[in-house]
Amino acid sequence: MAKGVAVLNSSEGVTGTIFFTQEGDGVTTVSGTVSGLKPGLHGFHVHALGDTTNGCMSTGPHFNPDGKTHGAPEDANRHAGDLGNITVGDDGTATFTITDCQIPLTGPNSIVGRAVVVHADPDDLGKGGHELSLATGNAGGRVACGIIGLQG
């Protein structure tokens, strides 16, 4: 079993820890808790780079090894890093579990060393009709991020 972890940091007071597990070549399970967010939906993505030298802005675009447009996690045409939305309660906290088959922890398309990013706004899943829908899901600014590392 492969395991990964990302500790989220933010200049806006958002904190969290995200865990990743994968059995063999199976799906990857993503689970975590994020706090300090406004209630509602927030876009949640794996970005291409594990670079936080300029905060979350230097994490690059969504992880997209197949060169597809943005979409929902269940869509055939989507970035590998498109994980949809997390739901934040009235207390500012989201606790979630997501399973996905396009974010392996091993192999040539591994997400280890890349970043996970929480966005300010809901991800429209590529269906919003906004000019940014098919690129970013029009999910707004990057409010927290962390580099995905291997966990023992």
From Swiss-Prot:
- So where does Cu cation get bound? H45, H47, H62, H119
Give me the reactions it catalyses.
2 superoxide + 2 H(+) = H2O2 + O2
User: Signal peptide position in this chain?
Assistant: none
In the Enzyme Commission scheme, what number(s) does this protein have?
Answer: 1.15.1.1
- Give the highest taxon in the source lineage: Eukaryota
**Which protein are we looking at?**
Superoxide dismutase [Cu-Zn] 1
Key words of the record: Antioxidant, Copper, Cytoplasm, Disulfide bond, Metal-binding, Nucleus, Oxidoreductase, Zinc
Q: Give compartment(s).
A: Cytoplasm, Cytosol; Nucleus
